[in-house]
Amino acid sequence: MPPTPCSLCHTARALVKRPKTGQQVCKDCFFEVFETEVHNTIVEGEGIFKRGERVAIGASGGKDSTVLAHVLSVLNKRYDYGLDLYLLSIDEGITGYRDDSLETVKQNQAEYGLPLKILSYSELYGWTMDKIVEQVGKKNNCTFCGVFRRQALDRGAAQLGVDHIVTGHNADDIAETVLMNIMRGDIARLARCTAVTTQSEDTIKRSKPFKYAYEKEIVMYAYFKKLTYFSTECIYSPDAYRGHARVFLKDLEAVRPSAIVDIIHSGESFVLEQSVQRGMKALQTCLRCGYISSNDLCKACALLEGLESGLSRSALRQTQESTSAAPEGHRTIPMFERYASLNGTPRTPPTPAEPVEGIERAVRTIEIV
């Protein structure tokens, strides 16, 4: 039986069957359509980027952020976006996981020549995820990590003096988030979670260039490009609530491959009525650390106070409404400062992080099986 020709160029042998479209394409055509689709997501409407922006790529060393760093570097040169790109990594303090994945980030930094900033939970909060799990257990530890990580990214971006954070959230991730918000009845977040770009007047802009990129295609891109990335799942994630949505989504995808994009489009169609929007809490600044919050005390400060007090997960909610200074002897989060002004006129940023030299450990790679 003769080999199947590429459905796009009709000359080379097809090596990839795209999960999203079912097209059978050759390797070079796959690279072209994948990169073009990401570019189209970036420039659609008013566009994600503005020329001259300083953009931090949230880099974990995993497949999504590794491919994102590679593709953005390529597209920035090909289409002359005029961006200053940086790598921003958060060290949650998970032994045997994050310490190894950061070595992959360092290799990516050396390969692409991008400045790298690493900010740790230990440095910022005085706690590592290993210590947090020791105290609260594995059942709800992702709540802590999600809250702490989001604030750490904003603080790292402020230290770099960047205008914009991009993350490797892919179509599967976004569809899972839509399902989670439906299952939790969180209507307010449904439309927001599907947006390519989110920003309020008090927050650093965040974007998801891989909004329509399927996870399987990201893996195939990394494989055929021979990109090095860290493949191990977080050791604390098997008990995460997101896992249930992921299993359900994979079952749907097996029956209907378009289910992922269909769910995203469903989330996009949710629009809150004005009466509901008016009833939502306005954003303010945390009285303790100065970070953005819908309460007098931000979630990170509330969770940290609970940890410092030795509270169990069930008792941590009691600290949410606290407005007083932290109890004596408790560690607190440093005051949050933006280095780029909110009105578009940048203040003088700190000196960007110096390139990281040397890779101390062997970097793991993954093969598609």
Swiss-Prot record:
One Gene Ontology CC term in the entry: cytosol
Enzyme Commission number: 2.7.7.-
CDD domains hit by this protein: CTU1-like
SUPFAM superfamilies named among the record's database cross-references: Adenine nucleotide alpha hydrolases-like (SSF52402)
Keywords: Cytoplasm, RNA-binding, Transferase, tRNA processing, tRNA-binding
Gene Ontology biological process terms from the UniProt entry: protein urmylation; tRNA thio-modification; tRNA wobble position uridine thiolation; tRNA wobble uridine modification
Record function comment: Plays a central role in 2-thiolation of mcm(5)S(2)U at tRNA wobble positions of tRNA(Lys), tRNA(Glu) and tRNA(Gln). Directly binds tRNAs and probably acts by catalyzing adenylation of tRNAs, an intermediate required for 2-thiolation. It is unclear whether it acts as a sulfurtransferase that transfers sulfur from thiocarboxylated URM1 onto the uridine of tRNAs at wobble position. Prior mcm(5) tRNA modification by the elongator complex is required for 2-thiolation. May also be involved in protein urmylation.
Protein name: Cytoplasmic tRNA 2-thiolation protein 1
Organism name: Cryptococcus neoformans var. neoformans serotype D (strain JEC21 / ATCC MYA-565) (Filobasidiella neoformans)
Lineage: Eukaryota, Fungi, Dikarya, Basidiomycota, Agaricomycotina
Gene expressing this chain: NCS6
